[in-house]
Amino acid sequence: MQAFTFHEGLVAPLDRENVDTDLIIPKQFLKSIKRTGFGPNLFDELRYLDHGEPGMDNSKRPLNPDFVLNQPRYQGASILLGRKNFGCGSSREHAPWALQQYGFRAIIAPSYADIFFNNSFKNGLLPIVLTELEVARLFDEVKAFPGYKLKVDLERQVVIAADGREMAFEVDAFRKYCLLNGFDDIGLTLRQSDKIRAFEAERLARHPWLESRPVA
């Protein structure tokens, strides 16, 4: 997965609490057996005025002009600002996939649902927890100043506001290591491939009868 070290990006404010995973990526889009193509249907029920289904040409669908991601000032946003309990609801890894494929690298909110929080780290999306007061101030600033950007320094574990103030955030050391190096679960396993092969060779030598053999 893509490594995350330092990111500066435009901020889009999604000013609602309890954003659930079905709102992030509705259930009808989970039928796909592929891991790609979810970005165009991120927040589908909020983003479009009609009902979306897999296979539709989204370029021909009517947009909701009131939805934040459809407003010109937030086009190209790569940091999503949210309220508490972001990512609640059912477990679906498609939610961080959709956010990431839209172009978001980080989310900032006061709290997250546990499963969404864990899935985000595993897919290279950084979910940052700040206090409700810090988040509320950021909402005010983002709405007041078009083109508002934030910097996220994962090495130092700080969010840097436009006025230069720094807001510290916590992150588990192992998750931080994986993000900084771009390691997902498969990547971490492959780093141990030499040890895995050595173990398999030793096991075969000690217990050859464990290997399946074709029947004559």
Curated annotation (Swiss-Prot):
Q: Is Chaperone one of the keywords UniProt gives this record?
A: no
At the top of the EC hierarchy, this enzyme's class is lyase
**EC number(s) on record?**
4.2.1.33
Domain of life, per UniProt, equals Bacteria
Q: Which InterPro entries would you find in this protein's record?
A: 3-IsopropMal_deHydase_ssu (IPR004431), Aconitase/3IPM_dehydase_swvl (IPR015928), AconitaseA/IPMdHydase_ssu_swvl (IPR000573), IPMI_Swivel (IPR033940), LeuD (IPR050075)
Pathway entry:
Amino-acid biosynthesis; L-leucine biosynthesis; L-leucine from 3-methyl-2-oxobutanoate: step 2/4
Gene Ontology CC annotation, any one? 3-isopropylmalate dehydratase complex
Query: What GO molecular functions are on record for this protein?
Result: 3-isopropylmalate dehydratase activity
Which PANTHER family does the UniProt entry name for this protein?
Answer: 3-ISOPROPYLMALATE DEHYDRATASE SMALL SUBUNIT, 3-ISOPROPYLMALATE DEHYDRATASE SMALL SUBUNIT 2-RELATED-RELATED
Its family remark reads: Belongs to the LeuD family. LeuD type 1 subfamily.
Q: State the protein's name.
A: 3-isopropylmalate dehydratase small subunit
* Species, as recorded: Bordetella avium (strain 197N)
The organism that produces this protein has a lineage beginning with: Bacteria, Pseudomonadati, Pseudomonadota, Betaproteobacteria, Burkholderiales
